Amino acid sequence: MANGKYAARKLKQDRQKHRWSDSDYARRARGLGKKSDPLEGAPQGRGIVLEKVGIEAKQPNSAIRKCVRVQLIKNGKQVTAFCPGDGAISFIDEHDEVTIAGIGGAKGRAMGDLSGVNYKVEKVNGVSLIELVRGNAEKPVR
């Protein structure tokens, strides 16, 4: 390895070459995160509810977390989204239009005991799901 007085260019070239061994760098440089992301890099996305599903929590927890299968409008991809709040699933029906966002897990992945669920429902037919759960708003009839 070059260590001399005028070795800066060689040191820089070697560093740039070996950076590609780091999988995080390689994914970032090639934009693979955005390519594989159903929302295509956007912070939120709209979709149509296909069905309600109950997903079992991972060990040591024991629960059935209420989620929905959503087909995104922009590209037709299907994702599972969590419905946060007590009784929130009752405000969501099939064929409703929902707005989803990332659930906030580490490195943009799943959160807590919900494996494979990377998104949460934020709005139902344009009304905030939290407002519906609290009783501050009513769901509009479509």
Curated annotation (Swiss-Prot):
Subunit structure: Part of the 30S ribosomal subunit.
The protein, known as: Small ribosomal subunit protein uS12
Known role: With S4 and S5 plays an important role in translational accuracy. Located at the interface of the 30S and 50S subunits.
PROSITE patterns: RIBOSOMAL_S12
GO terms for cellular component: small ribosomal subunit
Record's compositionally biased regions (Basic and acidic residues): 11-27
CDD domains, alphabetized: Ribosomal_S23
UniProt key word Ribonucleoprotein: yes
Organism this protein belongs to: Natronomonas pharaonis (strain ATCC 35678 / DSM 2160 / CIP 103997 / JCM 8858 / NBRC 14720 / NCIMB 2260 / Gabara)
A GO molecular-function descriptor: rRNA binding
Domain of life: Archaea
Assigned keywords, A-Z: Ribonucleoprotein, Ribosomal protein, RNA-binding, rRNA-binding
Chain segments carrying region Disordered: 1-44
Claim: Secreted is one of the keywords in the record: no
A UniProt-annotated Pfam family: Ribosom_S12_S23
GO BP annotation list: translation
Name of the coding gene: rps12
Record family assignment: Belongs to the universal ribosomal protein uS12 family.
